[in-house]
Amino acid sequence: MSGAHHLTPPTDYGKPVLAASIGISLALLVYTATRSTLPHVGDNLHALPHGGRYVDGTKSISYFSPSASKTRDPFPFAFLLILTLSGLILLLSRRRSNPHSCPSCGTPHA
């Protein structure tokens, strides 16, 4: 052997992965919260997304808004699902009393 070999710990990618996952999650949340799912009604100059009536000399548009009973906002359900899963992960991660114990048998090894 020509010299002493030094052991180096592997690169920790935890913080960049956490930052990327938070960024992607926020982007998806903003996209789903701000997109319009209402049907497009009208032409390129006259849009009636919330209902209404437009009468011109050559055309007439009558559209009544979608009823609130038919459309449901998925945002509260998604928020509740994320909150429940986060609480479950937190509960299960704190449930282990000794983080240095063996996951197979539960006893600490040297």
Curated annotation (Swiss-Prot):
Listed name of the protein: Movement protein TGB2
Keywords: Host endoplasmic reticulum, Host membrane, Membrane, Transmembrane, Transmembrane helix, Transport, Viral movement protein
Annotated InterPro entries: Plant_vir_prot
GO-annotated cellular components: host cell endoplasmic reticulum membrane; membrane
Segments in the Lumenal topological domain: 35-76
Cytoplasmic side: 1-10, 93-110
Family from the record: Belongs to the Tymovirales TGBp2 protein family.
Species whose genome carries this gene: Plantago asiatica mosaic potexvirus (P1AMV)
Domain of life: Viruses
Pfam families: Plant_vir_prot
Annotated function: Plays a role in viral cell-to-cell propagation, by facilitating genome transport to neighboring plant cells through plasmosdesmata,.
Cell location: Host endoplasmic reticulum membrane
Taxonomic lineage from the root: Viruses, Riboviria, Orthornavirae, Kitrinoviricota, Alsuviricetes
GO BP field: transport of virus in host, cell to cell
TM spans (from-to): 11-34, 77-92
